[in-house]
């Protein structure tokens, strides 16, 4: 399982929509969708940290 899959699985397991995650992170919802759809191949470290914080997970859990 790769980083994007882990993020999506965790987001869904916590019952968060992409819209809500967008609100929590400040990352535009369309950017989150493009990450999950793999339209954007690489996620910035800064955005990865924001997502992990919003999902309340340690970055070590997904990398």
Describe each model-derived feature in a short phrase:
Residues 1-2:
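A detector for short, charged/polar N-terminal pre-domain segments
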Residues 5, 29, 44-48:
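Short alpha-helical elements of helix-turn-helix
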Residues 5-24:
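Short basic helix-loop element that most often maps to the first helix and adjoining turn
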Residues 7, 21, 32-35, 62:
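Conserved hydrophobic/aromatic packing and binding residues within compact polymer-binding modules
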Residues 8-12, 36, 58:
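A broad helix-preferring feature
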Residues 27-42:
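Recognition helix of helix-turn-helix/homeodomain-like DNA-binding domains
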Residues 46-61:
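DNA major-groove recognition helix of helix-turn-helix/homeodomain DNA-binding modules
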């Amino acid at each position: 399982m790769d980083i994007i899959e882990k993020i999506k699985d965790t987001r869904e397991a916590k019952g968060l929509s992409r819209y809500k995650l967008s609100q929590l992170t400040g990352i535009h919802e369309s950017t989150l969708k493009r990450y999950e759809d793999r339209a954007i191949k690489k996620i910035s470290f800064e955005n990865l940290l924001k997502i992990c914080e919003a999902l309340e997970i340690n970055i070590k859990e997904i990398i």
